[in-house]
Regions:
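Short coil/turn connectors between adjacent alpha-helices in alpha-solenoid helical repeat scaffolds
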Residues: 115-126
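N-proximal helix/coil linker or "cap" segments that precede and/or mark the start of modular domains
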Residues: 127-172
Length: 172
């Protein structure tokens, strides 16, 4: 992680940060002490976050980035919901806009230290494939697109190898 900037809060606790627009949408982490908020930043966004230190990152308002708000909601849900409820919310996020950073985040979402989707489970892999297809189509040179494409390709290759081994055993 490369620090983007640091700042001093004014008497009201307000601050502002600016950075050059990224070539591709990307994640930025806003840290305050040991608390952090994950922001999905596109090249044209101005994001306004309203919260208190005690409630960061779970109780807040985010304007200017729907993906950031969705990610915050997914993170809050991961703390309180059942695994199935979290999977349903993550799936909805992916299906509604597989090209968004929120969808990318949703395929790597964890609960209790474990990923909620298994790349090697064909049913779960559909979520990864939806996101990788969108990212690879719209942003083929983006490092996140390339990395996800490689992961999904590797899982598909492993599945084909297993199927070939099973077929060979059945012939013998």
């Amino acid at each position: 992680t490369t620090p983007m900037d640091s700042c001093v809060l004014d008497e009201n606790g307000d601050f502002s940060l600016q950075a050059p627009s990224p070539q591709y949408p990307d994640f930025y982490r806003l840290r305050v002490g040991n608390r952090s908020l994950l922001l999905a930043v596109d090249s044209i966004e101005a994001i306004v976050v309203s919260t208190t230190l005690d409630s960061l990152p779970y109780t807040l308002s985010i304007d200017g980035s729907d993906a950031s708000l969705t990610i915050a909601q997914l993170r809050a849900t991961a703390r309180t919901a059942t695994r199935e409820q979290l999977r349903e919310q993550a799936q909805l996020t992916i299906v509604q806009n597989p090209r968004s950073l929120a969808a990318y985040y949703a395929v790597f979402l964890k609960q209790g230290g474990e990923y909620i989707w298994d790349l090697y489970n064909p049913a779960d892999r559909r979520m990864y494939q939806a996101v990788v297809t969108s990212f690879h189509t719209w942003m083929p040179d983006y490092e996140r697109s390339k990395a996800l494409y490689a992961q999904v390709s590797s899982a598909l290759k492993a599945e084909r190898e297993i199927q070939q081994q099973i077929a060979m055993r059945q012939l013998i």
